[in-house]
Amino acid sequence: MSKRVLIIAVVVYLVFTTQNQITGNHTTINSSSPSTTEASSTPTVSRTPQTTTTSTAVSTTITATTTPTASWTTQSQYFNKTTQHHWREETMISRNPTVLDRQSRASSVRELLNTKFLMLLGFIPKGEVNHLENACNREGKNCTELILKERIARFFSETEKESCYNTYLEKHLRSVSPEVSLTPYRVLGLREDILLKEIDRRIIRFETDSQRVTCLSASLLKPDVFIREQRIDAKPSNGPKIVPVDSVACMNLEANVDVRSNKLVIQSLMTTVKISLKNCKVVVNSRQCIHQQTGSGVIKVPKFEKQQGGTWSSYIAGVYTATIDLLDENNQNCKLFTECIVKGRELVKGQSELKSFNIEVLLPRVMKTRRKLLAVTDGSTECNSGTQLIEGKSIEVHKQDIGGPGKKLTICNGTSVLDVPLDEGHGCYTINVITSKRACRPKNSKLQCSIDKELKPCDSGKCLSISQKGAGHIKVSRGKTILITECKEHCQIPVPTGKGDIMVDCSGGRQHYLEVNIVDIHCPNTKFLGGIMLYFCRMSSRPTVALLLGIWIGCGYILTCIFSFLLYHLILFFANCIKQCRKKGERLGEICVKCEQQTVNLMDQELHDLNCNFNLCPYCCNRMSDEGMSRHVGKCPKRLERLNEIELYLTTSECLCLSVCYQLLISVGIFLKRTTWLVVLLVLLGLAISPVQGAPTEVSNVKQDGDYSICYFIFGCLVTAALLLKVKRTNSNGIVVVVDSFGRCPYCNEFTDSLFEEVLHDTLCSLCVCPFCEKQALDLVTLEEHVKECYKVATRKDIFKILGRKFTNALVRREKLFTTGLQLFINKTNVVVFALIMCFLLLLTGHNASAFDSGDLPDGVWEESSQLVKSCTQFCYIEEDVCYCPAEDGVGRKLLFFNGLQNSVKRLSDSHKLLTSVSIDAPWGRINVESTWKPTLAASNIAMSWSSTDIKGEKVILSGRSTSIIKLKEKTGVMWKLVGSGLASEKKKPFRFPIMDFAQVYNSVFQYITGDRLLSEWPKAVCTGDCPHRCGCQTSTCMAKECHTQECVSTHMVLGIGTGCTCCGMDVERPFNKYLGVKWSTEYLRTEVLVCVEVTEEERHCEIVEAGTRFNIGPITITISDPQNIGSKLPESLMTVQEIDDSNFVDIMHVGNVISADNSCRLQSCTHGSAVTTRFTALTALIKDDHSSGLNLAVLDPKVNSSWLSWEGCDMDYYCNVGDWPTCTYTGVVTQKLREFLKLDQHRKRLHTTLSFSLKKNLSKRSHTSVRLEGKTVTRMEVKVTALIEVDGMELHSKTIRLSGIRLTGLKCSGCFSCTSGISCSVNAKLTSPDEFTLHLRSTSPNVVVAETSIIARKGPSATTSRFKVFSVRDTKKICFEVVEREYCKDCTPDELTTCTGVELEPTKDILLEHRGTIVQHQNDTCKSKIDCWSNSISSFASGIGDFFKHYIGSIAVGVLGTVLPFALLILFFIYGDKMLWPFKVFCRPCRRCCRKNEGYNKLAEEEELRDIIRKFSKSGELINKDAKDKRTLARLFMSDNPKLKKEKKLSEIA
């Protein structure tokens, strides 16, 4: 009885205790700390239907403070508490099976089992797990410690791919799918699909209340990381106690801080050397297992025991990677202690002993702001894009069958270290250290960058100041200039050169679209000449020509004189050079026998021969004795002068061309100078006042379209000449002989070739007789069928041509009438007439057409534009420049905030930036502003023609249609002026059709990744047996060669010679260094166009056009065709290229360049010497060696080894080293492709020169990558669309309307001058009659212009407030506006039609604006006729001159007198010269005497002297005169005092 009572009491006690424990267990699970964010973040649901638990653990979290000196008492208490709980639960289940179901019992068994497994793996201290075997027996399982050891060994050793395991680590086939007892969870580094596929099969989670470890089986991941456990026995030595993390130089530790992601990555190369943590949270990746460890204690790594040959051996993970998040609060006081292993003395060559000393690794500390790190030079920032690749270190265990490039480190028996690889046979293991890439995983995926609107001064001038959270690349592009810069939280980037808006791509993918605030008024030299240049711009459409005209009037003749002087001496210089060159080949003159003097040249010798024989001096012509001749000639005072004359003559006569030019300058030089000045003056004047061929609308850096009217005229003349070849003129009686052209018979529809044949057809065919065979037909239908099949057509046609030519010529000669022949020609040559008409029309069209271009092609934000168009629908209403739409959830949001015109009132509705356009007609010229106000407009005005006009009361009802072909460029468009007929009062009602943007959309297919890869080789040798397969290559890109006999004495450890094998391998060590390229194949899909239709500010609609769209706004309907003439497209193959800086930081999203890849090698078809010999078909291949981001199963991805490398023409060999492993050599191998890849980037066609890309992003998702390309053509072959506008029943006010009571009040203006944002004005307008009228304003100042906007004035007690834009080119203190329609308000006073206000305009700031509105340009109206064009240009020129005189002189009359009178006197002086001094000679006798005196003693000009010298010689250059009767008289020709030379003046100095 007592036994039963005792048993019942025990059972009741156990039941009560177990229920409390279960409740506490559930509470513990639900309240588990979510601190394991690195390992898990996905909520999990337990199998219990009524209990929902959140599992936040992914990896083992060791929360207990465990140190190597932990007492056994603490461990015993821990195990007793755990086993007691499970034993009580087990007892309760055995006595009362209905308390928990089978799942609860299985969960209890699993917790006991996991505790045992973690003990055997070394993650928790060893101890007894009570009642585990009994619990397993009830489930039919064997859970003895020996069995569990064997299962763990098999789990980490057996590499059969089909081996799977359950929670008891029992092996089963993959086809058997056991029930997954736990819901899937996230594991750092593992994809969800792999986890769902392998959980509880080849991925096992060992989990207890406080620890979680996830391990991979050997069947899933090859267990190369496990090595025989070796205790490191290093000799103690002295060393530093505290070492900064960036100064650690230990053999057992590789530690580095990634400043871009705030991660401290610790690579342990000797896992038996303990690393102790204090107050840390670390994620440990030991390749086969991953766990998280929190608190203090030694970093745990998996190890197990394996029975081999009857003995148990301990295996441990040879390497592991520990990652510490420096921004985690749990790591604020983290400390790291370890034993630093370094090399000691060298035992033998290549082998050294180990020494050690204890150190504390000083970690970077995070400030409270969590923005900067102490003890880090650069500062630590978080990476902010998942497309970034960060460089780091990776370590692997290399066993005998594994090889690859990298730095090798071999540890033998825990006592020595070698630099060569050795395997377990020598008691060693080898660690390989390589450089790897890891992908950034930002915590915040919505990081953005902010841009300071004011430009900052920097070394390169002006820079953009950009701030962002984290580190990454920022791309700034402007036109064809692209800058990619690495930015860490804050950076300054120079403003790109060129024209156009600025696109900024942040690291996270956010795009900013900026414009420069400085307005370009297209009035040149305003910075230097100020307001004066504005008057020249108002005078002429060619202000530079007008400025040159003024300069030419004042300084033109001086310039012509200077040019003539330079030309004169330049010709003389070239003549001298030619003479000197020819003189070297000529012989000198001989010695004169008579005077005994050496003659200079042949002409001098001839002069001596003609004079010395008569005892005459050849230079002064004086007669003397023979003795006197020899004494006098050499010292004659005239000798040098005569020799200079001869030299000058020879100089000017050597080259005929130069001689002609020289004589021409001398004879007509003054006339040429005056004529040149006058002609240039007239040309400049004509150009200044001539009308322009439509104002050019291109930005200055874009090549403009020229005037093709001359080309059209020449083409028309050629066509006409070709058709007029049939008209031949002869001299027979002066008659024009006409050769007939083609005609057609109206009866038989047969073509006729002559007048004779036509008359024959008219005569016979009317009688139903065939003109060829003369057969009778029943009717005309039968005749027509017969003529088509008549067999005599060909022969009779030839006869008719001959007869027709004779008949026509005879007819014309007989009639003697040219008119008759001309009429025949006109009647019979309709083709020629049509051609002449077409040529004439082309000529007129070429003169009056206007371009629709509106500037350069800056990059567009296509996504924002598309969203904007889709958001602002017809259900929204428009106020000012904001589109308000009903909110879906009653919450307001604003896209593309528009500061300048944004209403400050917050509305509970969606608002979008309005798609407006401002058109400007500036009196100083056209305006061109690089803006982001989409769409800006080049208002090319087209007048509408009306097909019907009806009058109903004071209304005019108009209907009509028009068509326009528009060049497809973003931020451009066309504007129709709906000009009313003569009955309408409105002069114009603009109808705008702006094109916001357009893009060519492509479909892309990824081909491969390539780069300027770096190759590296490694040797491999074994003492006995065969070499490993492919020398241990683990990839498909390596090359290997082996020699089956080991002929080298490798080391002192190899005992035999010729008993082993040697091999060499070579593989890619770094896939890229300076260049990363991705090849794509593209397919053109479509061209999307964002267009808008705008009648007024209240009537606007936008749409994306693909296959034609129709808009309806009131009475106006517009139809748009498909895009046409799409000439420039992307090639079928292209390559995106990224240049990598010295930091080796890569962001695959920011593409720097796009080049054509049509001629590049295709997959597996290149030689080793080409640039793209290395191909990786998946991005996973770039990060396959990374272990700092969690478990890496990239090696299991088949795409990783689908890479390819060409080894054609390459070979490898080796040579022996005494006492060392052999050295590998190679031939034909290019180790790095930097030079080849650089040539590829430079020589291939760069596509951004022909297409402007609005989006160039490489995107990656898992192992797949894609590119988003949206571009537009920038070549001359531009895309076009056709727009058809139809107006049906548009109402305008008639001219009979009378306005009254117009009031303009409350004018307010504010803004800046010479800036893109301009001046914003508001005014209140009302009237008394009619009920509503559209008014327009214009400025009274020429420096201020008003946008072409309408002011709505309505009848009522309160005025209507209207807002409009104003632009000022200069600072002004007062702005006045007047009503354009003032002529319709007869009763209004000038004060009522004019309104003014004082303003304080801000100066232009050097800032950048984002999403702000402004103008691009406005094209001037075309004129109706040439006379009208010229009259308008002349009046504009005159008015500009008048404004200039008023402003700077004060009066037009004074300005005219002060300018025209000197100009007229200057012209008269040029025409009459010194003859204008005749009145002074008559009335002033002293002046007359002075003039006579000067005339007598005037020296000859240099030109006249040369004319006299040349006159003394004949054309052949001989010293002979036809009038000379004696040879002695020849000498007198050179005598200046000869009385026979009449009035020849004395020669001056000879040039």
Curated annotation (Swiss-Prot):
Protein family: Belongs to the nairovirus envelope glycoprotein family.
UniProt site positions, description: Cleavage: 105-106, 374-375, 662-663, 694-695, 849-850, 896-897
Alphabetic keyword roster: Clathrin-mediated endocytosis of virus by host, Cleavage on pair of basic residues, Disulfide bond, Fusion of virus membrane with host endosomal membrane, Fusion of virus membrane with host membrane, Glycoprotein, Host endoplasmic reticulum, Host Golgi apparatus, Host membrane, Host-virus interaction, Membrane, Signal, Transmembrane, Transmembrane helix, Viral attachment to host cell, Viral envelope protein, Viral penetration into host cytoplasm, Virion, Virus endocytosis by host, Virus entry into host cell
Keyword Membrane: yes
Signal peptide region: 1-17
InterPro entries: Gc_C_bunya, Gn_nairovirus, GP38_nairovirus, Hanta_Gc_N, NSm_dom_nairovirus
The organism's place on the tree of life at top rank: Viruses
Disulfide bonds: 1023-1216
Glycosylation sites noted in the Swiss-Prot or TrEMBL record: 25, 30, 80, 142, 413, 848, 1201, 1258, 1420
Protein name per its UniProtKB record: Envelopment polyprotein
Transmembrane segments: 547-567, 676-696, 705-725, 824-844, 1452-1472
Disordered as annotated region, ranges: 24-66
Bias-annotated ranges (Low complexity): 31-66
Gene Ontology CC annotation, any one: membrane
Native organism: Dugbe virus (isolate ArD44313)
Residue numbers on the Cytoplasmic membrane side: 568-675, 726-823, 1473-1551
Topological domains, Lumenal: 18-546, 697-704, 845-1451
Family annotation (Gene3D superfamilies): 1.10.8.1320
Gene Ontology biological process terms, A to Z: clathrin-dependent endocytosis of virus by host cell; fusion of virus membrane with host endosome membrane; virion attachment to host cell
Site positions (Involved in fusion with the host membrane): 924, 1221, 1336
Database matches in Pfam families: Hanta_Gc_C, Hanta_Gc_N, Nairovirus_Gn, Nairovirus_GP38, Nairovirus_NSm
